[in-house]
Amino acid sequence: MLNYSDISWAEKGMVATINHSRLKDKGVGQHQNAYNYKNQNYEDLRAECLRKGELFEDPFFPAEPRSIGVKNLGPNSEHMQNIYWQRPKDIIHNPQFITNDFSPTDICQGILGDCWLLAAIGSLTTCPKLLYRVVPRNQSFKKNYAGIFHFQLWQFGHWLNVVVDDRLPTRNNKLVFVHASHRQDFWSALLEKAYAKLIGSYGALSGGSTLEGLEDFTGGVAQCIPLQKPPGNMLRLLKKALEKSSLMGCSIEVTDNSEVETMTHNMLVRGHAYAVTGLEDVYYRDKLETLIRIQNPWGRVEWNGAWSDKATEWEEVSPDVRVQLLHKKDDGDFWMSYEDFMSNFTLLEICNLTPDALNTWDYKSRWHSTFYEGSWRRGSTAGGCRNHPETFWSNPQFKISLPEVDDPEDDSEKNEMVCTCLVALMQKNWRHAREGPQLLTIGFVIFSVPKEFQNLRDIHLKKDFFLKYRDHGFSEIFINSREVNSHLRLPPGEYVIIPSTYEPHKDADFLLRVFTEKHSETWLLDDANRFEHLQEETVTDKDLDKDSLQLFKIMANEDGEVDMYALHKLLNRMTAKLRNFKTKGFSLEVCRRMINLLDKDGSGKLELHEFQVLWKKIKKWTEIFKECDEDRSGNLNSYEMRLAIEKAGIKMNNRVTEVVVARYSDNMIVDFDSFLNCFLRLKAMFAFFLSMDTKKTGSICLDINQWLQITMWG
């Protein structure tokens, strides 16, 4: 019996991609139906440990130096001396998983440079409903304790259930990484371990952004807004974000490390993460004043300017408003005017939540969201940015329809007919290769779809389209970041989004997410795999010149037929005489495929009429090859191969194109023999499929015997 371990890595990747797509269609990967990371089922593993009376030890993230990291966190580094892995019960007498009085100030950073993760975890504590989506309840060091815990983390479009054992790195009986200030709670330390397992090691956590952590804890889309150059609809954007229960943070950026944790004259802390939690309009001195509520999660130091707890402005508003909004406590919560907010803080960060994160909440409105997973593959779908027009068209393409305009703005004199759209492009798995490849420079371009291309789906726009039409919008900049996004306001209509790397020929996987205020439709814009039945060639005696006819008779056997070997010699002599065409000749494999294509009686040979048909086809294929060989090099590049195969009658979608290029190109170069080998293989596979799909359903059912016969023959 064939074992999965016997299958090559390339085949495993293809099988994994197909299986992943099938599971996604069944709803696996949503929060309520998360993937079991590393195929580890928490309930099953815990039950097995309880049955055996053992404590769980995770084989995929062992209590070994390699789980901590390399270089500065390697086993020989200064930081990692005298490190021991201990379970919480070995550290303190009565450990708790999580208590009800958690707050951001309970979480302390260790020796690891992951303050960004610390801030994201702290933000979760301000929103218990989100926290308990990540940290499932009913976990304990007492009832059914087996040394195993689990967490739910979002990664690149899918929720994962990540299992860890509770062995944690310690020195002198104290945790060396994230820990609780009062030492009793261990949920934050174990959550950090689950995140480290997901990306490979603790060391891979060094360096990041708070928004990256918030995205992986919520599945939301994050955006940064510099407040020195805010968008024109800044106040509306804030109101909409709060209506949609978005998580928001603000800060005063620093340019020098010496400024971190220093205070302004109004008691705001530089380099400090604040939360934006509310927005209210109050009547003050006969006009409407917009106030913003800010929370300092890390301490009790508060703003002491206008509208602070003890400010005189509160004496001039109605008593009802004062009672409703003002709470004179040093609890980190305070109000300030919108103008003071804009002039004192320099950065606003927003994490827009997906509808599934809000499904049990009270909210006024929510985003409509869709996401697509895709890839850029060298030689097929990695076309680079618009600076590379010869290959830009080959990038994945996505169409979005925006039929409904936003609701009118209450505070605006002119109500534009626009659709708000948040587009976010994220590259996958960059932390997993932290010691190797780094982040690629990525971005996207948006084109308005002209009328003649609207309502089309089974099409991949080619080079001519992008040379003719201008883009309608674009990401702020192509940047080497995990994610780039743009908050756009577009007229109703259809648009095409082209995500790409800046340079062509860069391999990567990506996630494209689109958030809209109103209903929208999005879909992948791609060719359907299709075989066009071209008109069969009619041949006459004039299609072969006298020399070629004589050569056939010399090569043929007594029955007037040529086999694969004779055809090989015959074709190589004849193609050598073709004018303005370079070729190294045909391989035996291609000759075998040609015979399979035209051999009607199953003899494995071709008689004269069949050869005449073949020769006419070959001349047509050579013309297609020359037409697509734009630089007249005698070869096609892998992008031209897709166009040539299409001209020959076969359309391929991006996934099939990626496989074909990987199989039949040599460093993105395709000679005539490889082109024909690929085309004939595709044509044979289409013929087999269509003959089996008698009801034209687009799918067939094969047993192992039929599968092996067809694939081995093809």
UniProtKB/Swiss-Prot annotation:
Belongs to the peptidase C2 family. The keyword ATP-binding does not apply. InterPro entries: C2_III (IPR033883), Calpain_cysteine_protease (IPR022684), Calpain_domain_III (IPR022682), Calpain_III (IPR022683), Calpain_III_sf (IPR036213), EF-hand-dom_pair (IPR011992), EF_Hand_1_Ca_BS (IPR018247), EF_hand_dom (IPR002048). Keywords: Calcium, Cytoplasmic vesicle, Hydrolase, Metal-binding, Protease, Repeat, Thiol protease. GO terms for molecular function: calcium ion binding; calcium-dependent cysteine-type endopeptidase activity. Expressed exclusively in testis, where it is restricted to spermatocytes and during the later stages of meiosis (at protein level). GO terms for biological process: proteolysis. Residues 544-713 are annotated as: Domain IV. Ca(2+) 2 binds at residues 629, 631, 633, 635, 640. Signal peptide: none annotated. PANTHER family: CALPAIN, CALPAIN-11. Residues 355-527 are annotated as: Domain III. This is Calpain-11. Residues 55-354 form the Calpain catalytic domain. The gene is Capn11. It is found in: Cytoplasmic vesicle, Secretory vesicle, Acrosome. The active site is at 115, 272, 296. One of its GO terms (cellular component) is acrosomal vesicle. Gene3D superfamilies: 2.60.120.380, Cysteine proteinases, EF-hand. Transmembrane segments: none annotated. Its EC number is 3.4.22.-. Residues 528-543 are annotated as: Linker. It comes from Mus musculus. Calcium-regulated non-lysosomal thiol-protease which catalyzes limited proteolysis of substrates involved in cytoskeletal remodeling and signal transduction. Its main location: cytoplasm. Ca(2+) 1 binds at residues 599, 601, 603, 605, 610. It comes from the Eukaryota. Residues 586-621, 623-651 form the EF-hand domain.
